[in-house]
Amino acid sequence: GIVASFAKIFTNNFITNNSPLFNIHLSLLPKYKGPTPVESALFNLENFSGYTIFKINKNIDTGDIIYQKKVNIEGKYASEVYQQIYESFQIDILNIDFYKKGQIQENLVSNTRKFFKDDFNIQELTLQNAKTKIRAFDYLGPAFLKYNNINLKILNYSEMEQGSSIELSDGLLYPLYVIPEGKSKMLFEDYLRG
């Protein structure tokens, strides 16, 4: 069987009795093991990430790799990366040899961590760092700041320097869609009009 984002550790007995088991992990293992591989890759300004299918063993995200697919993530939002990987996997799964000998994971091991609400705050950040967090956390967060004394979640932004903006420490951010505290998703321009 294949599992994805199962967030559980199988017992050795379960693995033995149900072998082979495979996991799809949304990074190019052994890089970005753990719960937030897509967000961490974007947060760290990686240009490429992808997904890995590996044989499940008793340790977390360490089994032999049977397939990897590299994708360009430069400038993308996490939700776009998830969609890109999902679409790629739907095609690739038809041609994956699940019974070949896997490759042992070596070198470049890195781990991810769980992100919390404070991680999504862009209030005191530079423009570039705020944009990075908005892209990395659009699915998990989203990024937010205090604006007119309320929490304003920023879903995305424009690179075009036109329209209404929010002043950050070193530049202007041009939000497109926001979620004001206690309200639904709306255009930033509509929010400003009240």
Q: What are these model-derived regions, one by one?
A:
Residues I2-K114, D118:
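Donor/substrate-binding cores of folate-linked one-carbon enzymes
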Residues E106-G194:
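Internal anion-binding site segments
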